[in-house]
Regions:
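Active-site helix of classical SDR
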Residues: 90, 126, 134
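Conserved glycine-rich Rossmann-like NAD(P)H-binding loop of the short-chain dehydrogenase/reductase
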Residues: 1-13
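Residue(s) in the substrate-gating loop at a strand-loop-helix junction
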Residues: 110
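Alpha-helical segment proximal to the catalytic Tyr-Lys
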Residues: 95, 138-143, 200
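Substrate-binding pocket helix/loop in short-chain dehydrogenase/reductase
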Residues: 66-67, 71-79, 172
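C-terminal helical subdomain
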Residues: 149, 170-198, 202, 209-211, ...
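Active-site loop immediately N-terminal to the catalytic Tyr-X3-Lys motif
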Residues: 67-68, 101, 115-121, 179, ...
Length: 230
């Protein structure tokens, strides 16, 4: 398993988990918003393991903000961070994935790309675009490479903790049929399924990992806009 991100300490923690399972981990620190880092990651992976079978695109994120507070630059940055990175990373990986007999790409999207709620216009629109990118890639790369997406709901991560209050957490739990916030392992298990032979007849799909929510359970309490807004 090859892992890459900007924070090497986090990567080393993942590597230890991988090695505890009796597998080999390759740590490649880098900024994956930079195409050169992506090419280097693919090259390092192929050099170390001799092949590339699976790509999981998990770069992304954008903080919540009211519509009138979202600048053009931040809107475009959200697309670059959530969509363009997946496009570029996949393009760098595909020449090697084509040599595999069981190649798969998994894009980590979000429930925000399927449901609308206030405060997530940049993030949600970008994640919806990532879902559509997944469908197009599935068509482009079939039959050699399967491409699917995961749409997590509320997951207990540092990003969520940054704005999660006690009241908001209670509302999110009550708005989720399974009555809990998801864990990182819930998303990881879905990724393992989509990367494995168990999903060999699945491509171009979006797998919700959201506790069964049919609408956004995240209400930031942003006020209605009125005629006094200028």
């Amino acid at each position: 398993v090859a892992v890459s991100a900007r924070t090497e300490s986090d990567l080393q923690a993942v590597a230890r988990d991988v090695e505890a399972c009796g597998r080999t981990a390759l740590v490649v620190p880098g900024d994956l918003s930079d195409r050169g880092s992506m090419v280097s990651l693919v090259a390092s992976t192929v050099e170390r393991f001799g092949r590339l079978d699976v790509l999981v695109n998990n770069v992304g994120g954008t903080g919540p903000a009211a519509f009138l507070d979202v600048s053009e630059q931040s809107f475009e940055r959200s697309f670059s961070w959530n969509v363009t990175t997946a496009f570029n990373m996949t393009q760098a990986a595909v020449p090697h994935l084509l040599d595999s007999d069981a190649a798969a790409v998994v894009n980590i999207s979000s429930a925000a790309g399927r449901h609308a709620s206030r405060g997530f216009i940049a993030y949600g629109t970008a994640k919806a675009a990532l879902i559509q990118l997944t469908r197009h890639l599935a068509a482009e790369l079939a039959p050699r490479i399967r491409v699917n997406s995961i749409a997590p709901g509320a997951i207990a991560t540092e990003a969520l903790a940054g704005f999660l209050t006690e009241d908001l957490e209670e509302a999110m739990v009550s708005g989720t049929p399974l009555r809990r916030i998801g864990m990182v392992d819930d998303v990881a298990a879905a990724a393992v399924y989509l990367c494995s032979p168990a999903s060999s007849y699945v491509t171009g799909q979006v797998l919700p990992v959201d506790g069964g929510t049919q609408a956004s359970s995240l209400d930031l309490g942003l006020p209605d806009l009125g005629p006094s807004v200028r």
